[in-house]
Amino acid sequence: MESITLQSVIYQIDGQPYEGRLAYDSSRADPLPGLLMAPNWMGISTGAEEIAKSVAEQGYVVLIADLYGQGVRPSNADEAGAAMMPLKNDRALLRKRMWAAYDNLRTTSF
């Protein structure tokens, strides 16, 4: 994974910052297909980043979507449940956040 780069990507949804994580092979100059990754209910974590890097090794640009907002990183099941419940109860909100991440991935150039 020496040439896999993992970087923060900040985008806005309704004026609020969200911070996804982008993984890609920085040694490649050719266009690569993109993959939008939804993390589990614990949000963006070291485990999610490792999965994204592994997929990036296969020739993809991977964006881990931030579903909770910049700086919201649950550290236990209670926090994760509290962060996920609004999205579970409002699928339109979840879709909106996923679409915003997708739009960011689609328009990212590096």
Region roles according to the model:
Residues 8-110:
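Serine-hydrolase catalytic machinery in alpha/beta-hydrolase-like enzymes
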Residues 1-4:
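Short solvent-exposed loop/turn micro-motifs enriched in small/polar/acidic residues
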